Amino acid sequence: MKLQVLPLSQEAFSAYGDVIETQQRDFFHINNGLVERYHDLALVEILEQDRTLISINRAQPANLPLTIHELERHPLGTQAFIPMKGEVFVVVVALGDDKPDLSTLRAFITNGEQGVNYHRNVWHHPLFAWQRVTDFLTIDRGGSDNCDVESIPEQELCFA
């Protein structure tokens, strides 16, 4: 099956998580007016008394054409990925309880100035880079096991 890749927007992505970006977002000044603070852009949620981790993930580019055959989810915490050098990347997401609901499967491409924060329990493809090795600032949960993985029928990403 073919999965159309759409431009990432907060409206299209809201069921799956938050788009982390400054475009069309409110800010206030801090540090004597030298800094614009775009405040509270995503909900970080951590369950079971675990702690929030800030890491850097160095992702390798995916081989093209890209075929998706599995999704993962994290029931005990949100997970955010923010490219550190303005790289474009692709995310694949789906809703669903015990298994991904393929009728909700969507693929989005960022504009190079966006990150994503997956809500708890949102199915998503494991992180990969798009065109070159990419460092991602990652905010997620540390502690006990927090990753469910499910195989899905193969989906080939298609770009408009």
From Swiss-Prot:
Matching InterPro entries: RmlC_Cupin_sf, UAH_cupin, Ureidogly_lyase, Ureidogly_lyase_bac, Ureidoglycolate_lyase_dom_sf
Extract the GO molecular function terms from the UniProt entry.
ureidoglycolate hydrolase activity; ureidoglycolate lyase activity
Pathway listed for it is: Nitrogen metabolism; (S)-allantoin degradation
GO biological process terms, semicolon-separated: allantoin catabolic process; purine nucleobase catabolic process
For whether the record's keyword set contains Heme, the answer is no
CDD domains listed in its UniProt record: cupin_UAH (cd20298)
Cofactor(s) for this UniProt protein = Ni(2+)
Q: What highest taxon heads this organism's lineage?
A: Bacteria
Which HAMAP family does the UniProt record give? Ureidogly_lyase
PANTHER family listed in its UniProt record: UREIDOGLYCOLATE HYDROLASE, UREIDOGLYCOLATE LYASE
Which proteins does it associate with, and in what oligomeric form?
Answer: Homodimer.
Name the protein family: Belongs to the ureidoglycolate lyase family.
- What is the documented function of this protein? Catalyzes the catabolism of the allantoin degradation intermediate (S)-ureidoglycolate, generating urea and glyoxylate. Involved in the anaerobic utilization of allantoin as sole nitrogen source. Reinforces the induction of genes involved in the degradation of allantoin and glyoxylate by producing glyoxylate.
State the protein's name. Answer: Ureidoglycolate lyase
Please report the organism this UniProt entry assigns to the protein: Shigella flexneri
